From Swiss-Prot:
It comes from Danio rerio (Zebrafish). Coiled coil: none annotated. The active site is at residue 145. GO terms for biological process: cellular response to tumor necrosis factor; central nervous system development; epiboly involved in gastrulation with mouth forming second; negative regulation of apoptotic process; negative regulation of canonical NF-kappaB signal transduction; positive regulation of canonical NF-kappaB signal transduction; positive regulation of transcription by RNA polymerase II; somite specification. Gene3D superfamilies: 1.20.1270.250, 6.10.250.2110, Phosphatidylinositol 3-kinase Catalytic Subunit, Chain A, domain 1, Transferase(Phosphotransferase) domain 1. The keyword Phosphoprotein applies. CDD domains: Ubl_IKKA_like (cd17046). One of its GO terms (molecular function) is protein heterodimerization activity. One of its GO terms (cellular component) is IkappaB kinase complex. This is Inhibitor of nuclear factor kappa-B kinase subunit alpha. It is found in: Cytoplasm; Nucleus. It comes from the Eukaryota. The gene is chuk. Belongs to the protein kinase superfamily. Ser/Thr protein kinase family. I-kappa-B kinase subfamily. Phosphorylates inhibitors of NF-kappa-B thus leading to the dissociation of the inhibitor/NF-kappa-B complex and ultimately the degradation of the inhibitor. Phosphorylates 'Ser-10' of histone H3 at NF-kappa-B-regulated promoters during inflammatory responses triggered by cytokines.
Length: 758
């Protein structure tokens, strides 16, 4: 915490000064926190004695700022009454919302960002700062001093939001005060401001374009090592589409219309972003931005910016090669169309493409390709879809290695070559970026392996569901078969007992024996032990895969090497600031050592990762191969179940048919006994019985004449009553389905229990 300047109190009522946030051309900015509410505000005090013109502009600027309400412009707040006395002069204080994540310069200064921000961060900057600039211009405000130091970051609902600060109202842009007003910020000023010409909103286009370029590549576009007075004379004759100028070893300036490598941008974004920069970095202020669009009345550069931000881009990581492919989606494009484009670029046939989201969910062919893009999420580093080749269970390569920047390749080959520290700073920055990139590549591939594992677990869940279904149906079939076999054996036994004196049917008996044999054959269908063993073995494999150390991230060594490279880079930056000439040159042996170790370590962890991934894919393929077997088994079980039920129903019908015959016979006997007549069949039956009776012992012979007739009538009446009762019960149960009926009455014990009634 820095000591407050003279006349400034650290405590103002309930407000306590915590630290100095920054210093500008006109004042200091301090952080104050309310001890009662914990609210934080940034307070800016004007520290210079200004002339009357600038005093008026300072005061007017504060009033204007209080009227601005936009997410991407810092919000002005009322100054607490307790702080009114801390002003260093008679000028009002400016209180603003406090943005806790620092400024854009702080983000760009991180060693891992020395070759540019991540694509998602670049797109977020384009969206936020572009929106803020347009809002200011719509309110007739030109910022004139856009630079990374004047873009602050605030976290809102878990998302980083960029906000424009220091709107520059107190800056007098006449030639005499230019140097005092813009100390340290001239690199971002539009060329016309150096020439004292009149200016328009296009000065903000130039500053914004310069910031975009630096965020993409890590350095400013035009001779970034030179002062503006030096580079403006060399750059003024650049081509209308040139967006970069560098000086070669011979001192010759070379221009380019493209963004340099290394950067972190996808191929799909690179070209439209270069087009945007070509509009914003035109030297001619009249041509800059390309005028207003006739339809939207927006500057053409912001129309193009909106088009870039509205692009739906699918980023695909090909796990067979480690290469990232980006595809710009057309409106309502289907997944089939996207897969055809993937096939053309990766040579993986459409039917063999397995597109997995981070959660392991497969892309749905019935849904549009936009399912591969998350709403509100931009950049290939934020969300990516993983592509697997279903025809392979082992990935052997070749894996696409990250491109080594030319300058880094030079120091790897010429390790001991002494180079100027200023040159080494740029080269080592690219080396740090390369090492960070190797670690990020591994992290993405590990996420791909994790997606494959989650997909395997989803398949395993389905396998378990199928297994449980198969087991349930198998047990049901076994139960029905046991009942059917027990029933038919009992029926055959009882049929044999009564066939000598009751009803007989050779056709029915043959059908019963055939059904018994078929039921015995179905017992084999119900046996699923072999499949159960395969499934249990697969479950064990998957558990072992989950327990494997290779199922967890193995990038610890790479993280340590990255930190070592960053530390070497920081040490080099410190040397660059030392005036001692003996520190003016150095070799790259230490940095090259870290590069080589990182590459070797990445090779090792990738070998382990792909070995583990191959096991995951093999287990998944085993599950896929099992599904048809299980489905066929389920079909066979269902067919057997249906057949057994049909056989049982057929036997039920036969029983009812027998019952019908028995009822008809008893009805006929009753009619004969009442009329005194007897059908020929019954007469024949009686004659046969009489013959049999004559051969029986005296104790078993049928009574004669009147006694016999009375006894027969009574017996028939008793049987008729019992049959009538049985038919009545059957009629009442007729509405119930056969399956819902209680079959226990068919068991032997039930029949024995009921036999007294018969």
């Amino acid at each position: 915490m820095e000591k407050p300047p003279f006349r400034q109190n650290q405590v103002c009522g309930s407000w306590v000064m915590k630290e100095r946030l920054g210093t500008g051309g006109f004042g200091h900015v301090y952080l104050y926190q309310n001890q009662e509410t914990s609210e934080k505000i940034a307070v800016k005090l004007c520290r210079l004695e200004l002339n009357s013109k600038n005093k008026d502009r300072w005061s007017r600027g504060i009033q204007i700022m209080k009227k601005l309400k936009h997410l991407n412009v810092v919000t002005a707040k009322d100054v607490p009454e307790e702080m009114m006395h801390i002003a260093l002069n008679d000028l009002p204080l400016l209180a603003m919302e406090y943005c806790s994540k620092g400024d854009l310069r702080k983000l760009l200064s991180k060693p891992e960002n020395c070759c540019g921000l991540k694509e998602s961060e670049v797109l977020s900057l384009l969206n936020d700062v572009g929106s803020g600039i347009q809002y200011l211009h719509e309110n007739k405000i030109i910022h004139r001093d856009l630079k990374p130091e004047n873009i602050v970051l605030q976290e809102i609902n878990g998302k980083l939001v960029h906000k424009i600060i220091d709107l520059g109202y107190a800056k007098d842009l006449d030639q005499g005060s230019l140097c005092t007003s813009f100390v340290g910020t001239l690199q971002y000023l539009a060329p016309e401001l150096f020439e004292g010409k009149s200016y328009t909103v296009t000065v903000d286009f130039w500053s914004f374009g310069t910031m975009i370029f630096e965020c993409c590549c890590g350095f400013r576009p035009f001779l970034h090592n030179l002062q503006p007075v030096q580079w403006t004379s060399k750059v003024r004759n650049k081509g209308p589409k040139d967006i970069m100028a560098v000086e070669d070893m011979n001192g010759e300036v070379r221009f380019s219309t493209h963004l340099p490598y290394p950067n972190n941008l996808s191929r799909t974004l690179l070209e439209p972003l270069e087009g945007l920069l070509q509009l914003m970095l035109k030297w001619d202020p009249v041509q800059r931005g390309l005028g207003l669009n006739t339809d939207s009345k927006q500057p053409q550069c912001f129309v193009l910016l909106d088009q870039i931000l509205s692009m739906k881009v699918v980023h695909i990581l090909n796990m067979t090669t480690t290469q990232v492919h980006s595809f710009l989606l057309s409106p309502d494009e289907g997944l089939h169309s996207l897969q055809q484009r993937i096939e053309n670029e990766t040579k993986i046939e459409l039917l063999n493409q397995d597109l997995l989201q981070e959660t392991g969910v497969m892309s749905d062919p019935r849904k549009p390709a936009a399912q591969c893009v998350l709403d509100g999420v931009r950049g290939w580093d934020s969300y990516i879809v993983y592509l697997f080749d279903k025809s392979l269970t082992k990935y052997m390569g070749p894996l696409t290695a990250r491109t080594l920047p030319e300058s880094v390749n030079f120091i790897v080959r010429e390790t001991k070559t002494q180079l100027p520290l200023s040159t080494l700073k740029k080269v080592w920055g690219e080396a740090v970026s390369y090492i960070c990139g190797l670690r990020e590549d591994y992290s993405r591939l590990f996420q791909g392996q994790r997606a494959a594992m989650l997909s395997l677990l989803r398949f395993n869940t389905n396998l378990t569901r199928y297994k449980n279904m198969m087991f349930s149906f198998s047990q049901q079939l076994k139960a029905k078969l046991d009942f059917f076999k027990t029933s038919i054996q009992y029926d055959l036994e009882k049929y044999s007992d009564q066939m000598q004196y009751g009803i007989s049917s050779e056709k029915m008996l043959k059908a019963w024996h055939e059904n018994e044999e078929r039921a015995a054959a179905f017992a084999q269908v119900a046996e699923i032990g072999h499949l159960d063993e395969e499934i249990m073995a697969l479950h064990s494999e998957i558990v072992e895969l989950q327990r494997s150390p290779y199922a967890r991230r193995q990038g610890d060594v790479m993280e340590q090497l990255q930190e070592k490279a960053i530390e070497l880079y920081k040490q080099l930056k410190a040397k660059c600031k030392m005036p001692d000439p003996q520190h003016g040159y150095s070799d790259s042996s230490e940095m090259v050592k870290v590069i080589v170790q990182t590459v070797q370590n990445q090779d090792r962890v990738l070998r382990d990762l792909y070995a583990h991934l191959s096991k995951i894919l093999l287990s998944k393929q085993k599950i896929i191969d099992l599904f048809p077997k299980i489905e066929r088994t389920l079909e066979c079980i269902k067919e057997a179940d249906t057949t057994v039920m049909q056989m049982q129903i057929k036997r039920q019908r036969e029983f009812w048919h027998l019952l019908k015959i028995a009822c008809a016979q008893n009805t006929t006997r009753s009619s004969v006994s009442q009329s005194g007549e007897m059908p020929s069949s019954l007469s024949t039956w009686n004659q046969t019985q009489a013959q049999c009776s004559s051969r029986l012992p005296m104790s078993l012979q049928v009574p004669h004449e009147g006694d016999s007739v009375n006894h027969l009538l009574e017996e028939n009446q008793r049987y008729l009553t019992q049959l009538t009762s049985l038919l009545q019960e059957t009629t009442e149960e007729k509405s119930e389905s056969i399956m819902a009926q209680d079959w226990s009455w068919t068991k032997y014990e039930s029949l024995v229990a009921k036999s007294p009634r018969l």
